[in-house]
A protein has these predicted regions:
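Conserved RNA-binding domains used in RNP assembly and mRNA/RNA metabolism
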Residues: 1-75
């Protein structure tokens, strides 16, 4: 029998992989998921900020607050 997947398990499987994080304001951050906590605060490495699908700037390390995140998906 297969155990149901939990959201934090899915994030744990995405650790050290590139993800797309979309915020409530519509901005997207793409980078390697380094860490997260139970509040879904996330740290991305080699992060890039995208606005309206266009690269706005390269950030490096970014901390994104969980209550601003709407979607996290693999790249």
């Amino acid at each position: 029998m297969v155990e149901p997947s939990r959201p934090l398990d899915a994030l744990n499987n995405a650790r050290d992989k590139r993800v797309i994080v979309e915020l409530k304001n519509g901005r997207q951050y793409i980078g390697k998921l380094k860490s997260f906590d139970i509040h879904i605060n996330v740290v991305l490495e080699n992060a890039e900020e995208h606005v309206d699908g266009q690269l706005k700037r390269k950030i490096g390390t970014a901390f994104l607050r969980g209550d601003t995140i709407t979607v996290i998906s693999p790249e």
